[in-house]
Amino acid sequence: MSLPRHQDPIVAIATAPGRGAVGIVRVSGKSIGSLMQALLGRQLRAREATYLPFLDRSQLAIDQGIALYFPAPHSFTGEDVLELQAHGGPVVLQLLLARCLEAGAELDPVSQMPRLVGLRPALPGEFSERAFLNDKIDLAQAEAIADLIDASTEAAARSASRSLSGAFSQEIHILREALIHLRMLVEATLDFPEEEIDFLRQADARGQLSDLQQSLQSVLQKASQGALLREGITVVIAGQPNVGKSSLLNALAGAELAIVTPIAGTTRDKVQQTIQIEGVPVHVIDTAGLRDSDDVIEKIGIARTWDVIEAADAVLFLHDLTRKNATDYIAADAVIAEAIAGKLSASVPVIEIWNKADVIDRPCQQAGLQLSAKTGAGLDTLRRKLLELVGWQSKPEGVYMARERHVQALHRTAAHLMTAGFHLEAKAQALDLLAEELRLAQNALGEITGDFSSDDLLGVIFSRFCIGK
């Protein structure tokens, strides 16, 4: 799994671009003592913060700050790591980065060899990749680092921190250990068919498989909740012109984002805003009103409306209570409803909403949720309904931050275990097929933590990190 580039020493600015009080330049590699001497004029004691000048080639100070040295293997990457904490100006940090690269290429006065052969700028995520390759963290923990940085809600940050601490990985490890034990029983039965010992019956293989499936479902439920916290849901507001779609977006967002006028066709293109409901990011999209139109620009907007509807996790089909008895309005709504149903899979919920409840004198018996985007009446009910339909349990305390690939791997594991159960229950047990399904289930779990991963998968994952992590 290790590539030639993984042997190179690397350096990068580890703090976000822009001005700040403190900026960090991080170096990782093997035997960085000579580089330390060139940059700092001395060797550092391990894991001890030292305040001193950072020197250029002429031994003049570029800046003064704190230096920290973490010798291998007791560092984030598992290699020797040097961190320079300087003032956070972009020019200062670029000078320090350039000085590190320059010093790495300089000849050591004693050995007459470059101080740090091959020192180069780090690729995005390369420090975390080194930590993974050197068994300091597993793949799920590495991804949790990026998720913690990108967290947009408190619930997302806490669940990412939980995954980074190893809680999610520990659950996967327990599942894999149970799978390995079950595989051992099946392999023993296959390898010693002449023995008069029924390994599977004696060890209650059926019971073990059932327990494993139940544990897997518990982990899958928590991971699915974590995926909601990370990915959020995309909700599209759709309906005829002038039913209050833009007003509903503004009401949900608590801000005047979309233009609202009595003129039909005001919204020509989608308007998107991300809001939070119980810590879940909800990406709400206001769209052009659906109708037949001869206006070229409006027709483009309507086409885009159908595009976003097809990609939605949920659709809010908005109606106008004040026109509920108008024949032409009802007919147009029926056409739209049929078209929406044809665009979506059965798993995508469509919430029927009747707006302008504030205009109606008395309660209406119309089916669906009634609200007023103008007064806010009914919005809390809509928020709860949305989370309920996408499966949110409102208990983020035990949730792990998970990605869609984690959830899919868990689903594949469940499918393999189900097939394994069929083979186990069959009158003529196909033990070789049972063993294969258990092996595939174990591999699927291994993809989550990196125990079973291709180099291509690793490349995609770490390339999405920021530089310096």
From Swiss-Prot:
This is tRNA modification GTPase MnmE. GO terms for cellular component: cytosol. It comes from the Bacteria. It is an enzyme of class 3 (hydrolase). (6S)-5-formyl-5,6,7,8-tetrahydrofolate binds at R26, E83, K136, K469. Transmembrane segments: none annotated. Mg(2+) binds at S246, T267. K(+) binds at N242, T261, I263, T266. GO terms for biological process: tRNA methylation; tRNA wobble uridine modification. The keyword Endoplasmic reticulum does not apply. SUPFAM superfamilies: P-loop containing nucleoside triphosphate hydrolases, TrmE connector domain. The lineage of its organism: Bacteria, Pseudomonadati, Pseudomonadota, Betaproteobacteria, Burkholderiales. Keywords: Cytoplasm, GTP-binding, Hydrolase, Magnesium, Metal-binding, Nucleotide-binding, Potassium, tRNA processing. Exhibits a very high intrinsic GTPase hydrolysis rate. Involved in the addition of a carboxymethylaminomethyl (cmnm) group at the wobble position (U34) of certain tRNAs, forming tRNA-cmnm(5)s(2)U34. One of its GO terms (molecular function) is metal ion binding. Its EC number is 3.6.-.-. Belongs to the TRAFAC class TrmE-Era-EngA-EngB-Septin-like GTPase superfamily. TrmE GTPase family. GTP binds at residues 242-247, 261-267, 286-289, 355-358. The gene is mnmE. Gene3D superfamilies: P-loop containing nucleotide triphosphate hydrolases (3.40.50.300), Probable tRNA modification gtpase trme, domain 1 (3.30.1360.120), tRNA modification GTPase MnmE domain 2 (1.20.120.430). Signal peptide: none annotated. The keyword Ubl conjugation does not apply. It is found in: Cytoplasm. Pfam families: MMR_HSR1, MnmE_helical, TrmE_N. Its cofactor is K(+). Binds 1 potassium ion per subunit. Residues 232-391 form the TrmE-type G domain. PROSITE patterns: G_TRME.
